[in-house]
Amino acid sequence: MKYKWLIFILLLLPSFAFAQKSEGVLYGKITDNDGKVIELVNVAVQNTSFGVVSDARGNYNLTLPADTLINVVFSFVGYEEIKIEVRLQNEERRRHDVKMKVTSTLLPEMTVHDQSIKSSAITRIDARETVLLPSVGAGGVEDMVKTLAGVSSTNELSSQYNVRGGNFDENLIYVNGIEIYKPFLVGSGQQEGLSFVNSRLVSNIDFSAGGFSAEYGDKLSSVLDITYKKPTITASSLTLSLLGAEAHTEGMAFKGSMNYLIGARYKNTQYLLGAMDTKGDYKPNFADVQGLITYNISSRFEITALGYYSRNSYLMAPTTRETDFGNLQASYRLKVYFDGQELSKYTTGLGAISLNFSPNEDLNLKFIGSAYSAVESETYDIQGQYWIGVIDLNNEYNGEDHVVTNQGVGTYIEHARNYFYSRVYNLDHKGAYKYRDNVLKWGVRYQNQLFDDIINEWDMVDSAGYTQPHITDSILNPNNPMQTPLELKNVANGHNELYINNLDGYLQNSWQFENEKGGIWVLTAGLRANYWGYNGSVNVSPRAGIAFQPAKRPNMTFRLSGGVYVQPPFYRELRMFNGDLVSKDKASVQKSYQVVLGHEYQFKAWDRPFVLTSEIYYKYLTDIIPYEVDNIRIRYYADQKATGHAYGLDMKINGEFVKGIESWASMSIMKTTENIQYFIDAQGHILSQTDINNGADYVRDTIITGIPRPSDQRINFAIFFQDYIPYVPSFKVNLKLIFGTGLPFGPPESQRYQQKNRMSAYRRVDIGFSKQLISDATTFRNPRNPLNYIRNCWLSLEVFNLLGVNNVSSYMWVTDIYNIQYAVPNYLTNRQLNLKLIVEF
């Protein structure tokens, strides 16, 4: 079997936990200041996901390794967090009662590292919430991010998301301060494997939808900043489901001098893809393994090593497809019979070494060296013979609608031999210095990029017996016809090798002070600068943010942030449709001038804490590169430039809709458009910049304004909701709902200004029903029962796409006998079930 090594790891990891036989029990009762018991308090080992919750009587039982100094954290929404240090003897039972105090800060999600108030909105997500989240996508963390305000996604099979009118390439992702990159050739959600982020290894998740400070890098839209755990106890987990398996282990070694964190995952979506419209032989196999090891040389100096390896393979041999589309007035059925197959492979790796040195409590210095590489291939030869017919909805034949009119037949062939290799080296230095009420941060990075891209792809369409597009036959001399080469569609052919050296850095200061009336102010100002080696351009990005909390209304915070954000092209933005790279003089660094005004209101309803957050924003975009999206594949008009804007309103309310458990709902209203320069020739035809670069003549130029960008989703609404049976918290329900209005699209080979059609709205509900079979408080009569080594065990039944909505990922364009094009929807996954078993040791 191809993944024997992964199965071996999955079976081996639980044995690490079984070896920990020396244990003790910490137990007690948790009450408030008035002596009332508090249920559902999280009692956990610091910086881990291992813990228990108090029951309806406020009691808790936490099993801990013996002879180990451990920090235990007691936390609950609306109460101050309590930390204790404990060292238990073998088989010791120690009672520790806890009295919790009500805190003025209602929700712990709204915390910040350097100040109690943030100058720009940062949303913190509890990583433990991703464990029971129903998900078919590539990552639980990204699926949680999709429910936040300002974020939109219309493909559950992908971990990609849009933020405030931006595209997938405009989002920064960091893991332990290291920038994460994505595969280049992935073109559909079915091909996308596992995201880099392993939710089982995560400690903190911070997300900003815009207006972020200068310490974060050069992207236009968002930042997802993830910190992996630094374990203090030994623990493991194993998850099995119909979609794959994952396992992890964590702990300490060498008397606490070393911390280790290892995770492995395997995913197979054959079960999901087999129920889609296109039938055939699907063999998607995605696997990865990653580890984080920290060695503490002293209390002030540590070395951290992060390693990641991923191997993804997607084989599809389609046989048939049947899709109904249209409306009540005109309904059609498309049938396709296929030959051929597609095979895509993606192998990626990342290694990083980080040196963290703190000469004193106020100064921290970090040095990071990282290397990323990816070897990707996309090969396919697929022939489809299609048939279009009109469906008669009024009359049934054998209980089914039947086709009464043959509308067209045709054949198409898709061919690709694409190979891509990338390598990115980074050398970083970051520092932070605290003095008085100030925090000074700085950083500098050198980056070396290498890309080797071989592309060879084309399409051919033959409708009604002739090839499209075709050369007009010669009627002057039919006995000696013109010998002309076959013309193909969407031809891209080339071999590009590219070396780029980049340099960037930042300087930022934050300070907090009070005014005469006791109001608290936090001001952050910084400056970023980068040198882009492709064309030698230098860009400067000033950014600032200010927050104010009135003394008379400490439950309110007002924020204003913004600045200049630039994004040098990585590689995708440099490649034109024909496979060539744009010339250096025409390459542009995209820029965005942003301003964000926000308000945060903390209140209580039903005697429970809530937070209402709202932000309005405006972005002026300049030197942006127009693009189009097919499924999740982005293709840039690399030799064109545009200006544009995006503006909108984001709102989110989160709190205890159900006592003791946090849920939230978010809504976003947004509009984003762009203005593109076109040219008019002598016959009045509209030409693009690409046509002019290819030698076309024109009479005058014109600016077409108000073109909806491909990410122009006007309304987006999302809910993340948790519930449990009263007094029986072992029965839980997790629900995720996403609604988004349709995105713009247009026919193939059309210009951007022509792509104004709208997809149908994206509507999806995923729900999971979970039962905790074993908890830390569960005891068994036989002390030798192997189940005693299980700390938590959950069994979940997940229902994907509960409403059974046919959501659209993209369109297949076919032509009938009248030369009319039809946009046939490519539907995403339908309603399906998944069974998941989660075991924590």
Positions of PLM-derived features:
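Short, acidic, small-residue-rich periplasmic hinge/interaction motif at the N-terminus
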Residues: 29-34, 41-46, 73-80, 89-134, ...
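Short acidic/polar hinge/loop motifs at secondary-structure boundaries
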Residues: 60-63, 132, 179-207
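Extracytoplasmic beta-strand/coil segments of soluble accessory domains associated
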Residues: 142-182
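Transmembrane beta-barrel wall of Gram-negative outer-membrane proteins
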Residues: 237, 243-266, 279-318, 342-371, ...
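Surface-exposed extracellular loop regions of Gram-negative outer-membrane beta-barrel proteins
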Residues: 319-321, 551-595, 616-641, 736-750, ...
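Membrane-embedded beta-barrel scaffold of Gram-negative outer-membrane proteins
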Residues: 366-370, 589-656, 795
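Gram-negative outer-membrane beta-barrel transporters
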Residues: 513-517, 618-620, 639-744, 838
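C-terminal beta-signal and adjacent terminal beta-strands/loops
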Residues: 663, 738-748, 771-841
